[in-house]
């Protein structure tokens, strides 16, 4: 590569020999160039000399004194078809001090596709002349070329010569040359990167006329977007204010585009820009406000959204359909149905023509909240407005009616769809089929399924899932399993919902082994269980007494990346509570709090019970007080748990204090509350107090239950007044309260303690006749009664009967049998002495 110097005469003599025979003194027609013939002759001569490579420096007294700068550029242009010759001539002219135009040689090279060479020549110019050289040169020698201008701008930007790049752009636009958008954007980026936003503001009007709108992003929008992306918010806002104060025209459309981008994740910056627009222009329109209203609604900041809505109205801008629908939808999604409906009514009152989408979404909100009455009102208003429902509207109403159990009304809506020539969607069918299945009408559900197939609608996994769930809830598990296999035959992939339905169905039938088989199938089919799956399987393990397995499943959820919900925690906590392992239950509750899972009042009630089981009275009291002072209101179960807990630990004064608090609640004491207190009074032999409490129950309208009567009967049975127990037993039956096996056991126990074993046996038979299954307590009472009076054979027979019915003896019964030591041959399994018939 050559590095040029205009003072290097030695180089000139080496590279350019005399060529007097080639060139003659030329007569120019005028100052702008050669005649056509002379130009061609000069170009041909130079081309020949350069190709032969045998010329020295042109004679300075002849050529140098007559060939001016503009003439040099004309020679370059005449060599356009021979770019290599033109390049060598350009270099000679540069060395000769002719100051050839770089624009001209760039024009020649680019026209011939020699972009890399042009880049190198520009680099040479920078090396020799520095960044201050005249890039355009004698540009007036030829009309501007957009490609060359683009090239020069990009070269200048590459070297940080952003002011020269802008100069080229401005000059070209003044002459009507349109620079490609991408080049203008790159120049703007370079100006912004060089912190020369002031130059953009100075020439903003030229940039706006530079052809980058309306097909592209405006200069204003581009600059703001770039500055905001760099985090230079203040500079962006200052730029906007500057161009507005200088009187440049900025369209509100440009501002709206910037606001839309900012409202996604920079809502506060968008708010500042809007404030500036309101302060210095341009005049906002309804889209401007709707953009930010939508941004606030998506963030749930409804107060700010509504404030902006009011500002829009105050500035005389009438909200349109988009404004109202955006704000209404925001209120509904935030659960503020009242405000949403108020705005909905306001829009109708002001004559805003709400469309079917707004009406349908409004109906959908009320359907989802269970307020079908209001949904119907909105539907009627829609019809009054002359707006025809579409399939989506009808489907939403069908779903709501099905959820409300009004399946035949829903089917009527389905008829409306067909009558109006509309095509039901797959969601329409799934909603109706689900409605039929949930009301137990599987036949109609499957009939609709068949109709759907006949009409050419292929059922999806949702439809199949609904039908499988319907079969499972009806206990038709073999049909449910076969239908699931049919899904696989249709190449429909089973999902977790289908498996959950099957597992739940087997659990309802107490077929836990089958439920676990389905659970294992999920792994075979590559279906990942969800929290609901694990919770159901945990219940299976708990019901079979396998708490460790349930705990393993619980922690397996964490290993699989699942977050157990409140129901999963509650299921396990309650299980450990019932199995007298309160410490583990409390540890699980602590884990629940650490994982920030919100506990409902049911979980809190279990925790209170656990605390009392662990004798942590102060903690239970503190927990209860926190509930009262916090957002979660204790329910009747909470109060009853507290009263029962204090009573179990003989803290009757505290129990009475909670009882007094309960009296002033909106719900007050119930039957369970009074039964707890009656039980405590009976245990403390305060029969007068227990009878008085029983009377209060009748006065307050609380109906005693079998447990209430059982407490009183137990006290009478253990005292000398066994007849009192009989009277209460008869009274309970007269009032239509069915005695439980516990009630019968109390009477049997009282009779056995008095040696009235035959009467006790009759009562035992009455319990069986009443379809009650005697538990180990009932059997143990009567067996011990037989043993006490020496009727060991009958005791053995009853024991054998107990085993045949699947009731396992407890430790208390085993000790009683050991004490009376009946003959082993009587107690051996399989021996049956038929001296007295026993009930089957």
From Swiss-Prot:
Question: Domain of life here?
Answer: Eukaryota
Q: Which Pfam families match?
A: PPR (PF01535), PPR_2 (PF13041)
Give me the PPR repeat coordinates as residue ranges.
Answer: 98-128, 145-179, 180-214, 216-250, 251-284, 285-319, 320-354, 355-389, 390-424, 425-459, 460-494, 495-529, 530-564, 565-599, 600-634, 635-669, 670-704, 705-739, 740-774, 775-809
> InterPro entries this protein is in?
Pentatricopeptide_rpt, PPR/CCM1_RNA-binding, TPR-like_helical_dom_sf
Annotated keywords: Repeat
Note whether Metal-binding occurs among the keywords. no
**Keyword Repeat annotated:** yes
User: PANTHER family per the record?
Assistant: PENTATRICOPEPTIDE REPEAT DOMAIN CONTAINING PROTEIN-RELATED (PTHR47942:SF16), TETRATRICOPEPTIDE REPEAT (TPR)-LIKE SUPERFAMILY PROTEIN-RELATED (PTHR47942)
The similarity comment for this entry is: Belongs to the PPR family. P subfamily.
| Listed name of the protein | Putative pentatricopeptide repeat-containing protein At1g31840
Question: Which source organism?
Answer: Arabidopsis thaliana (Mouse-ear cress)
